[in-house]
Amino acid sequence: MKQRAALGPVLRLAILALLAVSYVQSQATCRDCSNRGCFCVGEKGSMGAPGPQGPPGTQGIRGFPGPEGLAGPKGLKGAQGPPGPVGIKGDRGAVGVPGFPGNDGGNGRPGEPGPPGAPGWDGCNGTDGAPGIPGRPGPPGMPGFPGPPGMDGLKGEPAIGYAGAPGEKGDGGMPGMPGLPGPSGRDGYPGEKGDRGDTGNAGPRGPPGEAGSPGNPGIGSIGPKGDPGDLGSVGPPGPPGPREFTGSGSIVGPRGNPGEKGDKGEPGEGGQRGYPGNGGLSGQPGLPGMKGEKGLSGPAGPRGKEGRPGNAGPPGFKGDRGLDGLGGIPGLPGQKGEAGYPGRDGPKGNSGPPGPPGGGTFNDGAPGPPGLPGRPGNPGPPGTDGYPGAPGPAGPIGNTGGPGLPGYPGNEGLPGPKGDKGDGGIPGAPGVSGPSGIPGLPGPKGEPGYRGTPGQSIPGLPGKDGKPGLDGAPGRKGENGLPGVRGPPGDSLNGLPGAPGQRGAPGPNGYDGRDGVNGLPGAPGTKGDRGGTCSACAPGTKGEKGLPGYSGQPGPQGDRGLPGMPGPVGDAGDDGLPGPAGRPGSPGPPGQDGFPGLPGQKGEPTQLTLRPGPPGYPGLKGENGFPGQPGVDGLPGPSGPVGPPGAPGYPGEKGDAGLPGLSGKPGQDGLPGLPGNKGEAGYGQPGQPGFPGAKGDGGLPGLPGTPGLQGMPGEPAPENQVNPAPPGQPGLPGLPGTKGEGGYPGRPGEVGQPGFPGLPGMKGDSGLPGPPGLPGHPGVPGDKGFGGVPGLPGIPGPKGDVGNPGLPGLNGQKGEPGVGVPGQPGSPGFPGLKGDAGLPGLPGTPGLEGQRGFPGAPGLKGGDGLPGLSGQPGYPGEKGDAGLPGVPGREGSPGFPGQDGLPGVPGMKGEDGLPGLPGVTGLKGDLGAPGQSGAPGLPGAPGYPGMKGNAGIPGVPGFKGDGGLPGLPGLNGPKGEPGVPGMPGTPGMKGNGGLPGLPGRDGLSGVPGMKGDRGFNGLPGEKGEAGPAARDGQKGDAGLPGQPGLRGPQGPSGLPGVPGFKGETGLPGYGQPGQPGEKGLPGIPGKAGRQGAPGSPGQDGLPGFPGMKGESGYPGQDGLPGRDGLPGVPGQKGDLGQSGQPGLSGAPGLDGQPGVPGIRGDKGQGGLPGIPGDRGMDGYPGQKGENGYPGQPGLPGLGGEKGFAGTPGFPGLKGSPGYPGQDGLPGIPGLKGDSGFPGQPGQEGLPGLSGEKGMGGLPGMPGQPGQSIAGPVGPPGAPGLQGKDGFPGLPGQKGESGLSGLPGAPGLKGESGMPGFPGAKGDLGANGIPGKRGEDGLPGVPGRDGQPGIPGLKGEVGGAGLPGQPGFPGIPGLKGEGGLPGFPGAKGEAGFPGTPGVPGYAGEKGDGGLPGLPGRDGLPGADGPVGPPGPSGPQNLVEPGEKGLPGLPGAPGLRGEKGMPGLDGPPGNDGPPGLPGQRGNDGYPGAPGLSGEKGMGGLPGFPGLDGQPGGPGAPGLPGAPGAAGPAYRDGFVLVKHSQTTEVPRCPEGQTKLWDGYSLLYIEGNEKSHNQDLGHAGSCLQRFSTMPFLFCDFNNVCNYASRNEKSYWLSTSEAIPMMPVNEREIEPYISRCAVCEAPANTIAVHSQTIQIPNCPAGWSSLWIGYSFAMHTGAGAEGGGQSPSSPGSCLEDFRATPFIECNGARGSCHYFANKFSFWLTTIDNDSEFKVPESQTLKSGNLRTRVSRCQVCVKSTDGRH
């Protein structure tokens, strides 16, 4: 609340200050507008206060039912549906980005042995393949296991931490190990008088009493298992069991009751040493370490071992049947198979032969030996609690119990007194290497070292399997491999069955393969193909017993087993964790008196001053007092001896899940899976009978088959023969019976014989305590246990006699102060122990001034003082000696290219070369500049008019000529009569959707009707008959809108109607040119139409992409679509068309030359020097430090005297190439070189983009005079940019050139001539030579005082101040509660130096050395880029100054462009006759002159002199009014992204501010920051994969050292397979331009595939696709505001941006980049559930919304 109260006034002041500023700004924005209208841009005012509440309106009529409500919350997840059918095979996808390497797969199951193939030919041994290219470094591995704890590092500097808030109470830790015995505590305070003691020690043990009757079961838990007892004697044989007849030899009697448990067996002999046990459990996971920075990529590792085969992939689509393969080598014989699943029931057998004679003795067999003990059963469920037993007799006194669990930690004590300075510590172990520093500058290449000694080859641990390397080069053809695993059966649709192969020879015995792991029972398989019918298949013989299988998965918990035989005595286990604390025992007997205690502390003096009386007699012992309050917990006592194990506690609650245990041994075989569905019978031929397999294990017993017919009774055996006969031979196999229905699974078989007990293993390590097991069966009675807990106290006995006096007791508690007289002073006591430090007391009153003391010891070093004032600059020092030559500098970067040399002397003219071969006709060149006028030829004599020639042969139709000059518009012709309607054409192919028409006019609003009741929906009508073609009726009045009816079924197509009249020309629609459709079938050629009248000029369309050159038609009304006609005969060249609209303005010119360099600013003031730090203790020499940052520049010293020349330094390394130098002076023109040989003809170039408009051609022949009817005035053109000034006019007709005269002497200065026509503005000249520095100007007028600033906000709390002077000691206060932890103490004194540590490993290469002495001054750099234009100066009118002196002549400028010919000047004086010129080109033939009167035939005269030029013509008609000038710029900024490598042009009439590269967003510290593509910040002038760095609170900044990323709009360059680096990146980065727009811009989105219109009063800039959002790595990203032009990209890409990794300097399209676009939404699907849809390449744009970027029109603004 205090903070809020304090912020209130500050906020009010800030608001008042802002209001004042806004008022001043609003006053300053409008200027004096009295004389001329001015455009005032006021800021928008703040929102007014709400008005008063109006009166309530009248109640409206009931409204129509509302629209459908919002969708309800998402329902619960439905049950999983059945798997859908397999889809059709999709199109082939695009090439994916390379995936990350997969994990190593597990071992696959061994495949089934293939059939033996025919032996192949022995192949040659292939040569070893070349090693593969080393793989790229793999991604960083998983974090390793925590390493061993490092050695202690050096003591760190004290941090400037502040006391943090107390943290939350932590969870209780695990009980600690018992501590070492602590020192004896101080004597406690004497206790109060105790209760009366219990009875004394028990007497000697009496004779044993008779056994009592068994008590009720006790409540206690089952005690620990006792040691095994001695081996009992063998009991007598039991009585014979009852006789019971079974059919064969021995008779098994019923199972007897379990006998009593035998005595404890003797310990067995020590077993052999067991196999080493499994590794122990992993240790507790360490505390999570600080997150390390991502390391740089390591060097490429060596090629790893081949990885294990991966997991089997999902089954592919079923392939076609392949060709028959070659026969394989005979396979190795397979292993003995595992036991099969139980077979189905066989068919019912025939009657067997008569059995052997029965009989046998009917005596019971002798009881068999006892079986081996069964495996211990799983622990049974806990039994119910027994009834409580009667209390037993009191046991003997128990031994002293062990120490209890350590108590909870006590409250924190007061801080102890400051200890003395400790001795120097033992030197610490060498610290852990610190983190690697920033890589230093590269040092010079070192000399090669000496060859090292050969290393010792201690074998290391085998490394982990590496990632698979890149594939090696293919080796030569290897030998034929073993037959592969049998593939899935192919389709038998296409292939023909192959011929049966020959049977191969049996192969040799193979090696035993590893047993595969049994899988879990599979799900029922799908129904198989129909199998072949087997007509005479005999069942196979029973195989031998197989090897034992692997253990299956652990089965479910079995029923509780019988108790097993006692096992051998195990070794004593490690001590378990301490059990929970037991219940408190009954009080023990009183102990013996202790020894007398130490004398107590001196008591407090009493207030009374009475004399002590004589000592009294000792009093009688009092009765036991009431028990006192429990005392404070004492300190933990010393660790006592280990007590007897306590009783097991109650089972605790379920603990948290433990760490994962080690993998258990493989379980036993699982149960067989359920049988699959019955397959259909197959079609194959029966195969050859197989060889008999190895003997398998007996399968599980199947269900009994149907009983056979009863056999014939056997003959009775003779009386004396009782032995059973051997079994007979098996009968012939019976005929197969009908297939029985699948039986239920058989019962589990009998429990097998228990195996032999294994050898006892070695003692394992103690495991973590497991969860408490279920209670086992009661064990064998153990030996006598320890004494029980003492019983409840007995009844108090009669009072005994007075005993002998005991030893003197402990001191009693301090008595209450007596009332006696004070005694004599006692003798001085022994010095007491040092007491605890008291709390600081309150300050005392100041004492009197003491005498002057001795001088004190020197004080600690004080803190640094404030920096002193700057001293006066020192006098110049003497000239120093020459320094030593510096260390050779590093290799410099390449220098800039030098300036051009002076031009060489022109060489001699070479001899003419041989004439070249005629070249191929070149492409049509651009029109050349007009040539120099030739000398006028003599006029020829006029010819006679010739005879009219015959008509020539009609020529081939020529190519379409270039457009002629625009003619005058013709008269409008009369409107033609409508033609006869033609026959209806055949219906054409359906065309593409047309452009959207303009919206129709709104109809008259109907009268609102009364609200009717809702009617029922009508039924759809039946399909109607097709009506006749309707004729046009008169247009009726618009009816009222009706309710929409139900949609009827589609009727049949009607007859084609009469074609309508030709509609008026529609307005041109907006839109981009569509994709060209497929070429239709050729149509019937149409008749040639009459030439139509010229149309009126249309409005300017948006600039489209350059389309194919089409014929321009007039937009007609859509007729019935016809087929394409056959190409017509080329028509004659048409008349010149009407003049078009003025064209778009041309592209802005090239940037001008750099401007004059600005005036050099004053040098800024130097900053104050920083506070010097404390001087630390001298440390040991540290490792080589990193280069420091450059220090602040010092104050300038006075100039020193010139020093002696130093010795020359070592030559520097070659520098980097410099920037290009300025152009040299123009050289003397060289002589004409020899002609070269003609080159080979080049390939035909691609058609270029449409070029800019060429220069005007030469004037054509004069046309026939046209009719001069004035055409309509065209619409005003777009505003043009201000033109450049024209060039100065050329002088008049050129006289003949005279001989070059000698230069004359300079004449006198003539009078100023008349001003000439203004010349065109010349190009900027090259930079002039920099002038000398001018004299300093006069100081300016001091400025006015500034306005007072806004009061600042309250500053943040400052840091802790320096410690103050120590105060006076205070009065001791009361004992406070434990305080917060204090600040860290001051740094302690340095210890003595330690002994030298173990030599460390070789350190990394040190950083670069200190920089050498400064090198010589470099050459001046090239001019920097042109700075941004400065701000506009004030608008005040300033009187022009006087004309300045002429400047120095500038360097010669670049050659200007050829100017337009100027106006004719007056004729010059005749020069002397020139040398005869070369013959000029023939002139164009003159027009035929008029026939003159016939003159006298005179001699031909010489040609006369040129006449005077004619007078000026009459002035022309006034021109059309000019367009409005450029609009007032409001500073709106627009950004345009080209999504190509071309820099985009700004829209017409807009000025480009800069261009650059399109930045989408950046990511750092796992967070991203988005750029709005419509804002100027998204167009960076320079590109880098890492355009930013990051800084932390330690004043350290890091660049390109972590996994930071940048994302840029990309081009349509094809996606690369691997990341691109350096110059390869440039083709993928989009370019952009920032333009200044005349008004605000917005983006409009249609959410359809139609281009939206701009709002009224806005005009279009470009159209595009609606880009909404993007995400990249870590699901970070951003989005575009839909109103920003950045949300409307001109081109759609599924991947419109690329990710660049800053530290690696590479860019790539990764698979986790997603772009999000607004989609199309139909009107009828606005509130429906969207249907899932996947669009393949080629159809992507069909669901992406279109958009248009619009700018506010500024036509009305002045």
Curated annotation (Swiss-Prot):
Residues 189-198, 258-267, 464-479 have a biased composition (Basic and acidic residues). Changing S1610L: In k193; temperature-sensitive mutant. At both the restrictive and permissive temperatures, causes 16-20 percent embryonic lethality. It is found in: Secreted, Extracellular space, Extracellular matrix, Basement membrane. Residues 47-943, 955-1304, 1316-1339, 1367-1525 are annotated as: Disordered. One of its GO terms (biological process) is embryo development ending in birth or egg hatching. It comes from the Eukaryota. Residues 1531-1754 form the Collagen IV NC1 domain. SMART domains: C4. InterPro entries: Collagen, Collagen_IV_NC, Collagen_IV_NC_sf, Collagen_superfamily, CTDL_fold. Gene3D superfamilies: Collagen IV, non-collagenous. Changing G904R: In E1470; 94% lethal. Keywords: Basement membrane, Collagen, Disulfide bond, Extracellular matrix, Glycoprotein, Hydroxylation, Proteoglycan, Repeat, Secreted, Signal. Localizes to the basement membrane between distal tip cells and the germline. Localizes to the intestinal basement membrane. Residues 42-1527 are annotated as: Triple-helical region. Pfam families: C4 (PF01413), Collagen (PF01391). Collagen type IV is specific for basement membranes. Together with fbl-1 and downstream of metalloprotease mig-17, recruits nidogen nid-1 to the gonad basement membrane thereby probably inducing basement membrane remodeling required for the directional migration of distal tip cells. Required to restrict presynaptic growth at the neuromuscular junctions in late larval stage and in adult motor neurons. Vital for embryonic development. Alpha chains of type IV collagen have a non-collagenous domain (NC1) at their C-terminus, frequent interruptions of the G-X-Y repeats in the long central triple-helical domain (which may cause flexibility in the triple helix), and a short N-terminal triple-helical 7S domain. PANTHER family: COL_CUTICLE_N DOMAIN-CONTAINING PROTEIN-RELATED, COLLAGEN ALPHA. Belongs to the type IV collagen family. This is Collagen alpha-2(IV) chain. It comes from Caenorhabditis elegans. The gene is let-2.
